Amino acid sequence: MENFASARFLLPIMVVFIVVILIPFLQSLVFSFTDYSGYNFADAKFVGFANYIRLFHDQQFWSAVGRVALFTVVQVPIMLFLAAAMALALDSMKLHGTKFFRISTFLPYAVPAVVSTLIWGFMYGAKYGLVGSFNGFFGTHLDMLSPSVLLASIGNIVTWEFTGYNMLIFYSSLSTIPHSLYEAASIDGASEWQIIKSIKLPELKGSLAITVIFSIIGSFQLFNEPSILQNMVPGNAITTYYTPNMYAYNLSFSGNQSNYAAALAIVMAVITMAIAYIVQLNSLKEQMK
């Protein structure tokens, strides 16, 4: 009876998991082995691994993967460093206006990604935006929407959006440290840097692993920012395959290739899960040292 009672509490979340995650995943998996175009699945034919073979020879797909990989390697460390620095500053108790600082730092995360991207897109404008005013005042020719710096500009938007979110995770982790450790360190004559190095940073290892995994998943799912900026950048700087998610979206809804888009989504899910698993294993090894 106790097991049955426990199962009843798990039932709602299991139903949500099956309906929202498991069924769509299995449906996409089935689509990826057919020639389904998005109209009538009854007419779809089984094609085996043809979609996956095509995908592994698709230069546009690998170009998109390489772009988000570069984005992840550069943007995630910068964002998490800023988040950790802000959390340490808040936890130091030496920062005036702590509540205001915490709320204002988290506020960008509460702004919808579409709105954030539009705001930054207008500021990036070389003619009428903030960058345009800067160019007019200093006589420069800075263009934040040019193809050479576009990925960095998108990274700046994402960093602005999610630094506060990660900061709260770090700050929550620091808040669990007993004050007795700080008192003992002060009695021993430890400096502020020694306290950070020996007490605070080790405490951040667990939360760092979580934020890294979430950030990697978010980076590989990059869609909103480049999609919104697509109509704001000159020329064809943001292509339909700029990121894997944009490529899958355009294949499915514009190209009537739901089967190929499903195969792409499955491969990206496997890649993302593999990277997240490796990060988690490394984190567990570090915590066991």
PLM region descriptions:
Residues E2-K289:
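A structural signal for multi-pass alpha-helical bundles of membrane permease subunits
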